[in-house]
Every structure is written in C-alpha cells, then in structure tokens.
Amino acid sequence: KAVAVLRGDSNVSGVVRFEQTHESEPTKIFIGQNSILALTVVVHAGTDDYGK
C-alpha cells in the first residue's frame, strides 16, 4: 500500500502516480507537471529522497 499526503492552495491540482516495478524495489511517487511541486520522490524503506 502507498499513501501520499499533499497540501497546497485550493487552486492547486494535479495527478499523483505510484510506480513499483517489483515488490523489492523502491516505490516511485510521480507528482504531475501541473502540480506546484512537479517532482518525483523515490521512497526507500520508509524514507524519501530527502532522508526524512
């Protein structure tokens, strides 16, 4: 299971896509180009690219 919590202004919209090629691979979270973030976060064992 994957869950994303995104916060932003009421006019922010977009698509979030989760991708995992294999159960042992990290989950990639793609945040659409129309979002204010416009980035991809790769989750490794409970952390993100930023080590949180």
Curated annotation (Swiss-Prot):
Organism this protein belongs to: Debaryomyces hansenii
GO molecular function: metal ion binding; superoxide dismutase activity
Lineage: Eukaryota, Fungi, Dikarya, Ascomycota, Saccharomycotina
Enzyme Commission identifier(s): 1.15.1.1
Cofactor(s) listed: Cu cation; Zn(2+)
Catalysed reactions, as listed in the record: 2 superoxide + 2 H(+) = H2O2 + O2
Keyword set, alphabetical order: Antioxidant, Copper, Cytoplasm, Metal-binding, Oxidoreductase, Zinc
Record note on cofactor: Binds 1 copper ion per subunit. Binds 1 zinc ion per subunit.
Protein family according to the UniProt entry: Belongs to the Cu-Zn superoxide dismutase family.
Function as written in the Swiss-Prot or TrEMBL entry: Destroys radicals which are normally produced within the cells and which are toxic to biological systems.
Cellular location(s): Cytoplasm
Keyword DNA repair attributed: no
Name of the molecule in the record: Superoxide dismutase [Cu-Zn] 2
GO CC terms in record: cytoplasm
